[in-house]
């Protein structure tokens, strides 16, 4: 990097910070923080624990955005000041230090952009994730299990908890279906960009001729919705089927029709749960999944109306990412256009840069 390139980078980052400042409105956020702190001084504040909890979460999010904003803003304007001084004094050592720090400077502004993209109404919620293999039998089912492991490892890296709602193993390998909740701050905000079709290209370990296969698996992500959010679900719109749970679980599981499948006929959304031996608990978990999926569906429909997208384009039916393992190694996201060669690390849950790249591209 030379002085011209670094100067252009500073112009870009300075303009970006100006735009972000207009959106973030740091003075208004600081004012809101002061209001919350004043509210928390009131002895009656904690009488309504649910409301107090929400306001405390808002405070934490606001503090995080402000801290990230000030860190990025200070770093950019300090760099501009040092750059001008070093140029004037022909201080080559300081200039080299600034050039070396350019990547860190970009990462700070990127972190701020990501924080902004995680400020949606339900971005801080837990995420309900469902993975369904496409046609292709064992190969697709194995691909579904690879994606399942990827998300579990991602959750583990972040210290998030995972609760399995429904797990149906494949006959030979992999999984036929899995639904689970990832519990942690901004789990939905990050994983909402995973909605869609994931494509795998590799030499199949299940093909004795060692031919290359292409497999598809759909991933659906919706926010875990609080009980106080009203989602209207009419009984007449539901078809509820019970069946025997598959897979391990002992004799009791196989004798009792404890597994539940609920179909919401107006939208065609299907959810199922067989995680518990209690049919009542499985039905409760399935209804929670349905509520979240319907909420996500309605939000997507509203956004589509704003964007002028055809109704047929709404949903989870679009290919969003390709994972190529042979003849070369590459993961490419169709929305951000970013390509990565560290396929093994990504499949081991190292997906933050992937997710953040999509979040930032959607902000533009």
Curated annotation (Swiss-Prot):
What is this organism's lineage?
Bacteria, Pseudomonadati, Campylobacterota, Epsilonproteobacteria, Campylobacterales
**Does the record bear Acyltransferase in its keywords?**
no
Query: Known Pfam families for this protein?
Result: PCRF (PF03462), RF-1 (PF00472)
Which GO molecular-function terms appear in the entry?
translation release factor activity, codon specific
SUPFAM superfamilies named among the record's database cross-references: Release factor (SSF75620)
User: Domain of life of the organism in this record?
Assistant: Bacteria
Protein name, as recorded:
Peptide chain release factor 2
Modified sites of kind N5-methylglutamine:
251
Give a GO cellular-component term.
Answer: cytoplasm
Q: Which family does it belong to?
A: Belongs to the prokaryotic/mitochondrial release factor family.
Record keywords, A-Z = Cytoplasm, Methylation, Protein biosynthesis
Cite the post-translational modification comment: Methylated by PrmC. Methylation increases the termination efficiency of RF2.
């Amino acid at each position: 990097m030379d002085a011209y390139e670094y100067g252009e980078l500073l112009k870009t980052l300075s303009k970006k910070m100006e735009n972000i400042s207009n959106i973030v409105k740091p003075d208004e956020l600081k004012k809101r923080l002061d209001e919350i702190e004043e509210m928390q001084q009131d002895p009656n504040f904690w009488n309504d624990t649910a409301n107090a909890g929400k306001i405390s979460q808002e405070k934490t999010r606001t503090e995080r955005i402000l801290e990230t904003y000030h860190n990025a803003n200070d770093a950019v304007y300090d760099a501009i000041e040092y750059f001008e001084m070093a140029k004037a004094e022909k201080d080559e050592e300081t200039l080299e230090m600034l050039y070396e720090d350019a990547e860190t400077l970009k990462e700070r502004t990127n972190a701020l952009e990501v924080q902004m993209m995680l400020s949606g109404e339900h971005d801080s919620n837990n995420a309900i994730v469902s993975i369904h293999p496409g046609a292709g039998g064992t190969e697709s089912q194995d691909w579904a299990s690879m994606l399942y492991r990827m998300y579990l490892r991602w959750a583990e890296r972040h210290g998030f908890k995972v609760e399995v709602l429904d797990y149906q193993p494949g006959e030979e390998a992999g999984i036929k279906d899995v639904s689970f909740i990832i519990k942690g701050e901004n789990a939905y905000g990050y994983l909402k960009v995973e909605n869609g079709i994931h494509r795998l290209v590799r030499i199949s370990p299940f093909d004795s001729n060692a031919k290359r296969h292409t497999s598809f698996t759909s991933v659906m992500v919706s926010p875990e919705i609080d009980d106080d959010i009203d989602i209207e679900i009419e009984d007449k719109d539901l078809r509820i089927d019970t069946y025997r749970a598959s897979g391990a679980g002992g004799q009791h599981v196989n004798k009792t029709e404890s597994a539940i499948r609920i179909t919401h006929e107006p939208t065609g959304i299907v959810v199922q749960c067989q995680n518990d031996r209690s049919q009542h608990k499985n039905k409760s978990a399935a209804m929670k999944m349905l509520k979240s999926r319907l909420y996500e569906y309605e939000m997507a429909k509203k956004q589509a109306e704003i964007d002028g997208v055809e109704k047929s384009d709404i949903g989870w039916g679009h290919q969003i990412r390709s994972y190529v393992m042979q003849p070369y190694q590459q993961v490419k996201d169709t929305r951000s256009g970013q390509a990565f060669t560290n396929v093994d690390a990504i499949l081991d849950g190292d997906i933050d840069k992937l997710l953040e790249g999509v979040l930032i591209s959607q902000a533009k």
